[in-house]
Amino acid sequence: CCEWWKWWWKRGGRDPVGRAFLPKDERCFVIEKNGVPVACYFLFIMEPHIVGWTTYLVSNPEYKEKDRREIIKTLVTSVEKEAEKIGIMQLFTICGNKQMTSIHESLDWMLIPVQNEGFKYLTNNFIKK
């Protein structure tokens, strides 16, 4: 996934998300077709386990088959099912483009347009090397 991020994120002039900002491995989901990784998606779980946040969906830029959308849709559905098994009652996500918005809408997500979204790194909490 890291190489995919480098490819996608360089288009926006940003560095990809660091591993420290991702959930534990058991909350990192990868979907493959015929042994070729197509996309990955991440699930953060809030305490108590009522709300989950799915994020950082990234796809293999070299996978250009026509079934790409359906494979990504299957990945989103699979993460929904895993969240449901854990007891999550609501999932939250932010769709960064038309394709992801369309996929989530087709899966009955309620999407609300957001004018601005933001984040801030609290760098005083970073380990200094």
Region spans (language model):
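A conserved beta-strand-loop-helix scaffold within acyl/acetyltransferase catalytic domains
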Residues: 5-34, 38-59
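C-terminal "cap" of GNAT-fold acetyltransferases
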Residues: 116-129
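Solvent-exposed amphipathic alpha-helical surface segments
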Residues: 12-16, 82, 86, 129
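Short, ordered beta-strand-loop transition motifs
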Residues: 47, 114-116
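Acyl-donor binding region in acyl/amide transferases
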Residues: 52-109, 114
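Short, solvent-exposed polar/charged micro-motifs at secondary-structure junctions
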Residues: 38, 102-103, 123-125
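Short loop segments at secondary-structure junctions
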Residues: 34-35, 62, 125-127
